Amino acid sequence: MPANTSAAIARSCEFSQYLHRLLTARPEERQRLEQSLHHPFSLEDMQAFADWPALDAPEALAPALRRLRQAVVARLICRDLESLATLDEVVSTISQLAEFAVRQALACAAASLPQYGRPIGEDSGEPQQLIVIGMGKLGGGELNVSSDIDLIFIYPEGGETDGARKISNHEYFTQVGKRLIALLNDATADGQVFRVDMRLRPYGDSGPLVMSFAALENYLLSQGREWERYAWIKAKAITGDADGLAQLVRPFVYRKYLDYNAYGAMRGLHAQIRREVARRDMADNIKLGPGGIREAEFIAQVFQLIRGGRDRTLQLRGTRATLERLAALRLLEPAAVAELQASYAFLRNLEHRLQYLDDQQTQTLPEAPETRQKIAASMGHADWPAFLDALNEVRRKVSRHFEQVFILPSEDSASHPLSELWLDVAEQSPETRLAELGYADPAAVARQLTGLAQSQRYLQMPLAGRKQLDALMPALIEVAARFPNADDTLSRIIGLMEAISRRASYLALLTEYPQTLQRLASLYSSSAWVSAYLSRHPILLDELLDARMLYAAPDWPLLAAQLETQLAQADGDVEAKMDALRHFQHAQTFRLVAQDLAGMWTLEALSDELSRLADLVLAAAVRHAWRDIPSRHCETPRFAVIGYGKLGGKELGYASDLDIIFLYDDEHPDAPDLYSRLARKLSTWLTSATAAGVLYDIDLRLRPNGSSGLLVSSISAFRQYQENQAWVWEHQALTRARFVAGDAGIGSQFEAERHAILTLERDPAKLRDEVMAMRQRMLDSHPAHDGDVKNARGGIIDIEFIVQYLILAHAKTLPALTGNTGNIALLAVAAEAGLIDRRLAEDARAAYRLYRRLQHSARLNDRKTVEVDESLRTAYARGRELWRQVFEQALDFS
C-alpha cells in the first residue's frame, strides 16, 4: 500500500469519528479502502459487491446492503476530504447507492410474498409493479452522504393478485412497501442503509402508504397544494412506469401558462421555514437558515414553476443543472449563476463535512471549539474565524440573489398616493385630480374607471386577484398620465386589465415586476394595434420583463434552433406543437413591433425581418406537419412552399395574410395523396384558432386554376400551367413570388421556371391592354379614394402594376428586372436602363416609401384610412404622371 494512501486515510479519520470507528471495527474495510481509494465507487462496483441474486431473503439482503453502504461512504469520505472527488461525484454516487438499494430491497420484498402471486391490473390484465418514487435530493441525484431518503409508493392499477391467497393490489403493495422500508430503515448491528421518510406522500402521515395512479391523479387535481408542486419537481421513478408517472404529474407541477403566482407560493413556503428557524433557534443551520441551501434551491425552482410548462428544458430535477439552464436562457445573469453555483457548492461541501463527523444528518454548525477547528480545517481554512468569514460571505451572496428574485412587491393598495382615487372612484368625483395629472377629458376617464370598479368582472374576482388589481390601478393611472395621449393610453390599459382580470398569473406578473408598467404604458401610448394584440395574447406581457431581450435584434439562426428545441420537446403532441409555433411567432412579432416603435427599424428592414420570421415558421411547420403524416414513404418531404404577394416581395406587415402555393416533385405513386394531406394539415396548423390564437391567415387562391384547382401541384404541372394556361395577371403575380420553405431543390426549379416565364417575349401593346384592363377590374371592385393609399390613383397598386408591366415587357432584354428585390429597387433598375424617366422614377420611389409608411402607421393605430395632406396629393400626382408615361404614351422605350 502506498504511504500516501495510508496517510490520506489517517487524515480523513481525523475529520470523521464515524470513519475512524468503522475502520477500527472492520479491518477488512480498511483494506478494501486502501486498495480502491483512487477510484470512484461506480454502479458496477456496487453490483459486484455481493452475489445479489442469491440474497433473496430479507435476513440475507439487509446486512449486505448495510455493508455496501459502509464501503461506499468510507470511500466517499476519504476521496472528498483528500480532494480526489468532486461534489458531483459525491452526490451522484450516494444517490446511485440509494437507487440501487431501493431496487434490491423491492425485489426482495416482492419475492418474500409468494403466497399472493402476482398483482394483476383490473383494466389491462397485466402484472403490476410498484413504482418507487425518489423525492427531494434523491430524485434530483444530489443526495447527502448521511441523508434520509424521501420516498412515495404508487402502483398503476387496482385489481387483485393471482396467487393461492388472493388479496387486493392495494393490500399487496402495502405489504411490499412496509418490507422495503424495513430492509432499508431498520437499525441493526450494522446500522441502517438509509432512513426512509414517507411524509411527502399524499395526505402525509395520515395517508395510505401506497396509492394507485387514479387516486394520485385525483389527489393532485383536487387537493394538491402549492408546496407539493415544488416537491414534485424532483420526483423520479426509481422503479416501474416512469413515463406513466411523468404524464400524470407533469400537468400538476408545470402549468401550460406562465405561472407568476409561484412567487407568492414560494414566498409563503419560505416565510414558513423562516418562522420555524426562528422558533427553534436554527440560525446556524446552513440548509434552512438565511442564505442557506434551501434559498439557492428556491431560486432555481421558482423559475421552473413559472416557466417549466412552456419550456420543457427547465423540467430538470437537479439544482445545479437548473441554474445552468437559467443562465443559458438569460433568465438569470451568467455572473449571478456563477456566484450561486460557487456558493451552493461551498454550502453542500460544508454540509457533507458536518455529516462526516459522525454520520449524522445535520446541517447545524458545531459549538465545540475542537469540532469547529476540524470543520474549518476540512474546508481549507486556518481557523474558525477565517472559515466563518468565508461562510458569512457565501450566505450574504445567496441572500442577496434570493432577495433580488423574490423581492416583495407592494400589494398594499393604500400605500400609493393615488390609491384613494381608485378605491373610492365610484363614491367621489376624481375629475379634478385626473385633470391635475394631465388627462384631457377627466370626466370620460372617471367614467371608465368607475365602469371597471363597478363591473361584474371586477366584483366577482377572487379576493387575491382583486387585491392585486387594486394595487396596480393607482400605479397605472399615474404612469399613463406621463404620456401625451394619456386618455387613450389609460383607456387601452383598462381594456387589458379587463382582459386579464380572471388570469391571476398575469396580474401577479405586473405586481411582481412594477418596472414593466412604464414599458407597457409606452407601447400602449404608441399603438392601438399593439394594445389589441397584447390584450389578445397577454402571455406576451412576459416579454416586457427584460428590456435587453425585448430590444435585441433577432438572431434568426439562434431563434430557429430554440424553436426546433421547443417543437422537439412536444414530439407526439400536435396541439402542443401548434401552440409552440404560435407562442414563438407572437413573441417575435411583439419584439419587432416594440423595436419598430422605438425607431430601431426602417420600414423596409422591418418587412425583411417579418418575412424572415414567416419563412422560419413555415419551414418548421412543414417539417413537423410532415412527421404527423402516417404511411409517409420518406423522412423529408419533396415539397415546397412558394410565397406570393407581400410574403414573396418581402413587404410583410404585422397582420399581413400569407399568399402561398404548394409544389411537390416526387414520382412515388402515393405522392399526390400524401402531399395533398400535408398541404391540408399545414393549412390547418397555420390557420386554426387554438388556445394560443392563430398563426397566420393564408390565401391559396394564386395556385394554378385558383380556388377550383388542386391544393398542391407537381412542379411539372405548375410549369405546364404557367407556360400554356396562366393569365397575364398570374404572370404579374409571379413577379413577386419566391421559394419560402421546404425542399430547396424544388425551390431552384421554381426560380428557374419563374425566370423563364418572366423573360418570355411579349407584345407590349397587348400586354399594356391586359394590365390596364386588370387594373380597371380592381378599380370597379375597390374604387379609388385619396384616403386609401393602396387603391388611390397614383398609389401603391398603380406603382406595383407599373413595375410588373415593365418586368413582363422588358425582362427578356433586361434580365435584371427578374430579381425579387422589391418595387423600389426595380424602379431604379428600369430608370437606369432608360425604360422610364429618371426623375419620375425617383419621385415614384419616394412616393411608394411614403405610402408604405402611412399605411404602416394607420395599421398601428387601427385606422382604415390616412390623412390626406399636400405631400400625399403631390405623391399621388407623381405616381399618376409615371402611369401616364408608361401606359398612355408610345411604348417603344428603345
Swiss-Prot record:
<keyword id="KW-0511">Multifunctional enzyme</keyword>
<dbReference type="InterPro" id="IPR023057">
    <property type="entry name" value="GlnE"/>
</dbReference>
<dbReference type="GO" id="GO:0000287">
    <property type="term" value="F:magnesium ion binding"/>
</dbReference>
<dbReference type="GO" id="GO:0008882">
    <property type="term" value="F:[glutamate-ammonia-ligase] adenylyltransferase activity"/>
</dbReference>
<keyword id="KW-0808">Transferase</keyword>
<dbReference type="InterPro" id="IPR043519">
    <property type="entry name" value="NT_sf"/>
</dbReference>
<dbReference type="InterPro" id="IPR005190">
    <property type="entry name" value="GlnE_rpt_dom"/>
</dbReference>
<dbReference type="GO" id="GO:0047388">
    <property type="term" value="F:[glutamine synthetase]-adenylyl-L-tyrosine phosphorylase activity"/>
</dbReference>
<dbReference type="Pfam" id="PF03710">
    <property type="entry name" value="GlnE"/>
</dbReference>
<dbReference type="GO" id="GO:0005524">
    <property type="term" value="F:ATP binding"/>
</dbReference>
<keyword id="KW-0460">Magnesium</keyword>
<comment type="function">
    <text>Involved in the regulation of glutamine synthetase GlnA, a key enzyme in the process to assimilate ammonia. When cellular nitrogen levels are high, the C-terminal adenylyl transferase (AT) inactivates GlnA by covalent transfer of an adenylyl group from ATP to specific tyrosine residue of GlnA, thus reducing its activity. Conversely, when nitrogen levels are low, the N-terminal adenylyl removase (AR) activates GlnA by removing the adenylyl group by phosphorolysis, increasing its activity.</text>
</comment>
<feature type="region of interest" description="Adenylyl removase">
    <location>
        <begin position="1"/>
        <end position="410"/>
    </location>
</feature>
<feature type="region of interest" description="Adenylyl transferase">
    <location>
        <begin position="415"/>
        <end position="894"/>
    </location>
</feature>
<dbReference type="Pfam" id="PF08335">
    <property type="entry name" value="GlnD_UR_UTase"/>
</dbReference>
<protein>
    <recommendedName>
        <fullName>Bifunctional glutamine synthetase adenylyltransferase/adenylyl-removing enzyme</fullName>
        <ecNumber>2.7.7.89</ecNumber>
        <ecNumber>2.7.7.42</ecNumber>
    </recommendedName>
</protein>
<keyword id="KW-0548">Nucleotidyltransferase</keyword>
<comment type="similarity">
    <text>Belongs to the GlnE family.</text>
</comment>
<dbReference type="GO" id="GO:0000820">
    <property type="term" value="P:regulation of glutamine family amino acid metabolic process"/>
</dbReference>
<keyword id="KW-0547">Nucleotide-binding</keyword>
<dbReference type="GO" id="GO:0005829">
    <property type="term" value="C:cytosol"/>
</dbReference>
<keyword id="KW-0067">ATP-binding</keyword>
<dbReference type="InterPro" id="IPR013546">
    <property type="entry name" value="PII_UdlTrfase/GS_AdlTrfase"/>
</dbReference>
